């Protein structure tokens, strides 16, 4: 009888003992970043001993592509709709012709030096629009005290992604003084141009970037095709560590694999900016950014549908909407 009572007491006390032990263990564990660190005045003395890690060069929001899947990335073109779109398209085509001509890219055979120099220059420009758009939407959210609904993060991640393209290419080749000077001048011009343009017409800037990314996909597709056909034989076939970490590439990844993932990034920016331009055109710039759901959990797209509506129903309505939109494109 005594043993039965003892066993019941032990069984009843077990949860309390377990909770107490866990609490004590939790209390005993000092947090890595907590009040002790927050109450300090400076961490200046730690700067000389902080290790340099390539993984810290970017945020954790990194692209994850399947190499076989992105082999199917296609060259696409969205036809201009109206004066704003036409102006954006003509501007991009003019910029491409001027750059291809003065950089001599369109003359002679394709070489590794031409490709890397071209990418170095263009990626310094490509990282500007996302930062400008993200900054202005950030200021707008503060000014009007309203939620941004996911646009800012997508634009800033785009800017960071383009910068990581640049960080990769400078590991393959360091630009000379003339190229560095031209980059500084071009960046200043593009920043001021895009800043003013975004204040006046965000639709124009997003459409401009969409067409710019169309050209980028064309360029990178041409590079991949030249490698496949043997017209371009890369000597720098080892992918830099910063690229392997950022895109989660294997150690035996090739220069072609690198171009493949960068092309996929540009294709994503292409559809994102064309979508944002379409949203401005339809006065939906204050709506939720669809890519915050599409890229992470597409099933949520159907969670807000009326009761009884199925995924198939939503898809058919989406097809009708796309058809109607295409009539105006």
Swiss-Prot record:
Transmembrane segments: 115-135, 181-201
This protein's record includes keyword Cell division: no
InterPro entries: AOX, AOX_sf
Pfam families per UniProt: AOX
Cofactor: Fe cation
E.C. numbers: 1.-.-.-
Cofactor binding: number and manner: Binds 2 iron ions per subunit.
Gene Ontology MF terms: alternative oxidase activity; ferric iron binding; oxidoreductase activity
Main location, first listed in the record: mitochondrion
Location in or out of the cell: Mitochondrion inner membrane
Keywords: Disulfide bond, Electron transport, Iron, Membrane, Metal-binding, Mitochondrion, Mitochondrion inner membrane, Oxidoreductase, Respiratory chain, Transit peptide, Transmembrane, Transmembrane helix, Transport
Residues engaged in binding Fe cation 2: 162, 213, 266, 269
Gene Ontology CC, one term: mitochondrial inner membrane
Major enzyme class: oxidoreductase
Topological category with respect to the lipid bilayer: Multi-pass membrane protein
Residues reported in the UniProt entry to bind Fe cation 1: 123, 162, 165, 266
Domain of life of the source: Eukaryota
GO biological process, one term: alternative respiration
Annotated region described as Disordered, given as residue ranges: 300-329
Subunit record text: Homodimer; disulfide-linked.
The protein's role, per its UniProt record: Catalyzes cyanide-resistant oxygen consumption. May increase respiration when the cytochrome respiratory pathway is restricted, or in response to low temperatures.
Family: Belongs to the alternative oxidase family.
PANTHER family named among the record's database cross-references: ALTERNATIVE OXIDASE
Protein name from the UniProt record: Alternative oxidase, mitochondrial
Species in which this protein is naturally found: Trypanosoma brucei brucei
Lineage of producing organism: Eukaryota, Discoba, Euglenozoa, Kinetoplastea, Metakinetoplastina
Gene: AOX
